[in-house]
Structure formats: structure tokens, C-alpha cells
Amino acid sequence: MPSFDIVSEITLHEVRNAVENANRVLSTRYDFRGVEAVIELNEKNETIKITTESDFQLEQLIEILIGACIKRGIEHSSLDIPAESEHHGKLYSKEIKLKQGIETEMAKKITKLVKDSKIKVQTQIQGEQVRVTGKSRDDLQAVIQLVKGAELGQPFQFNNFRD
């Protein structure tokens, strides 16, 4: 029986490149001359820390980072940007988490979405991925289009196709 896995993964190498590109753009921006502004990637914790002197500049840095991520093929929905910024002395900062893997709640939403569509496939939650098995390839392609079309707030990739 044909099957595939639904996963949510980000290549940390591409994130590193996006952060470096954002820092390069930051160094050439006129409105950030003489301002203490930093974008740092912590690969162990899978977070990006943005620090600057004002809340407005913090929002500008986030826009620069999102633009760099999109250019590197990383969807901005894979960044978990907090609404509130932290204030330490004269610096404002935000710690952006990278969404890796599918959490149990999201996996249940995907499973419910597929079951409600009445497509004749079975879904299994396997850790941080969802396996979809069906009798025909057309059913699996219908599930892929269904999941891509649903706005679930997280980018998904489809891999491990088996016939």
C-alpha cells in the first residue's frame, strides 16, 4: 500500500544563512547606523535572539529577518515570534523559536482534517510526524493538496513516499 510521511522540518544551515544575510543587510541600513542591533542564532536551543535599542527597531529587525528567511526558502510561519518583547536596561529583545517537528495537538488536527475529508486513507501519529497510508496514489495526492490548502499555522513537508 502506498504511504508517505507529513513532517515539519527546518534546515538549520539555511536558517544560519538567513541570519547571516539579515546581519549583512543590517550593517548596510542607514537607520541602524550607530545603533546596537544584533541578530543571533542559537543552534542548540533552535532559537534566534534579536536585540536592539527600541521596540520600533525590533519590529524592523524582525521584518529584515523574515525577508532573509523567505529568500532562503524558509516559510515565516516556521518562526514562532512572541508578541511581547523583553526589556533589559536600554535594550529590547525577542527570542524567536524555530518550529521543528509536529506537536501532538497539530498531529491530531491533521488527522481530524483528513478523516473529515472522507478520503479513504489511514493516518498514524508517529512521534513528530504523521504517516498517511492509502490504497491509491490519487488518494495520497488528494491528502497532500488538502494539508497544503489548510491554514494550520505551520509549514509541512511530505517525504518518505513508498509504493
Curated annotation (Swiss-Prot):
Family that this chain belongs to: Belongs to the YajQ family.
Keyword field contains Nucleotide-binding: yes
InterPro entries: DUF520, UPF0234-like_C, UPF0234_N, YajQ-like_sf
Job description of the protein: Nucleotide-binding protein.
HAMAP family: YajQ (MF_00632)
GO molecular function: nucleotide binding
UniProt cross-references to Gene3D superfamilies, sorted A to Z: 3.30.70.860, YajQ-like, domain 2
Pfam family name, one: DUF520
Protein's recorded name: Nucleotide-binding protein CGSHiGG_08790
Record's keyword terms, sorted: Nucleotide-binding
Domain of life of the organism encoding this protein: Bacteria
Record NCBIfam families: PRK05412.1 (NF003819)
Any single Gene Ontology cellular-component annotation: cytosol
